[in-house]
Amino acid sequence: MSRRRFDCRSVSGLLTTTPQTPIKTENFNNFYTLTPKELGRGKFAVVRQCISKSTGQEYAAKSLKKRRRGQDCRAEILHEIAVLELARSCPHVINLHEVYENATEIILVLEYAAGGEIFNLCLPELAEMVSENDVIRLIKQILEGVHYLHQNNIVHLDLKPQNILLSSIYPLGDIKIVDFGMSRKIGNASELREIMGTPEYLAPEILNYDPITTATDMWNIGIIAYMLLTHTSPFVGEDNQETYLNISQVNVDYSEEMFSSVSQLATDFIQSLLVKNPEKRPTAESCLSHSWLQQWDFGSLFHPEETSGSSQIQDLTLRSSEEKTSKSSCNGSCGAREDKENIPEDGSLVSKRFRFDDSLPSPHELVPDLFC
C-alpha cells in the first residue's frame, strides 16, 4: 500500500465554522516588530517573537504559507484558527490574539510562552533537575488541556514534547499546548483515517490505517510521560523501519535500569497508555483520577532558588532553543512533513535515544509484513 496523498480542499475532519477572530488585511509590520528571535521553523511555517508597537507586549508570530506544493491550504489554516478559538477558555492551550493575512501567508499572533518546549526537560542533561513531582504537575496539566479538546470532539494528533510549551522555565511554569495543524474533528458519521505525524510518536492505529479516535492522543501522552521520566524516547530505532516495528509490537523498555528512579505508580500510568488496542487505553478524564496524579506533593516542586544546578537548566534550555529548528503545521494532506525537528546543529544536546527525520515514508512501504 502506498502512502496516500491528500488534497487540502478535501481533507476530512476540518472545522468548517467561520473564524470569529477578524482576519486583518493591514500590514502586520505596522502593528508589530519582529525580533531576531526565531522560535521555530518548518517548510511551510516560521514562528518568531514579535512585540506589539502599541503595548510593548511580547507575542509569537506564526507565519503560515497558504499554498503548499501547489495546493491551496487556506482551509486548513482556518481550521487551526477555529480550534484555537474553540479552546480559548482553556488555560493549557496557547491563546490566539490576532490574525493577519497577506497575498501569500496568514500570520497567527499567539501568546508567547517564554519557557520553550518541554522537550528540553527530556534531555539527559536535565535528569537531576526535574523531579517526578514536577512531571506529575505537567502531565496533569496536559491531560486537562487534552480532556478539554476531547470534550469538544477535537483530537490533536501531534502531541509530543516539541508541541508542549512552558509559560516559564525559571521557575518551571505551566504548560501550553500548541500546533493544531494536524488536529481533526471527530464524532461525525464518517471515520477518520490518515497517515500523518512524526515517526517515533505515531500510534499503532495510524500505522495500521485504522480509524483515529481520542485514544490516539492518549498514546502520545504515554510517550511524553515516558520521555520526561526516563529522558529517552521509547520507540525510536536506528531507522524508520525499526521505529515502526517497535511501535507495532509495542517494544518498550521497562527494565529496572531504565526505571530505577521512577515510581511504580508512574510506571503503571505509562503502561496503561502504551497498549496497542486503542479501546483499552484510558481516557484523559479517567487518567486524571489515576493514583499517580493524586499523590502530587505541593511542597517539593521545582524551586530554582533552592537548586544548586538551577543555572544549568536555564543554560541548557537557552542553548537548545537557540540551536534547533522546529516543525511546520502542514500535515499529510499537504504532502510529507519535511520540517526539521529540533536538532541542535552540533548534536550535543540530543540523546542517542532521540532521532528525528525530515520526512514520513509510508509505514506500509517500510514494514509491509506488519500490515497484512
From Swiss-Prot:
Compartment(s) where it occurs, according to its Swiss-Prot or TrEMBL record: Nucleus; Cell membrane; Endoplasmic reticulum-Golgi intermediate compartment
Gene name for this UniProt entry: Stk17b
Name recorded for this polypeptide: Serine/threonine-protein kinase 17B
SMART domains to which the protein is assigned, alphabetical: S_TKc
Taxonomic path: Eukaryota, Metazoa, Chordata, Craniata, Vertebrata
Comp. bias regions, Polar residues: 307-319
Function: Acts as a positive regulator of apoptosis. Phosphorylates myosin light chains.
The organism of origin for this protein: Mus musculus
Assembly information from the UniProt record: Interacts with CHP1; the interaction induces CHP1 to translocate from the Golgi to the nucleus.
EC assignment: 2.7.11.1
Main location: nucleus
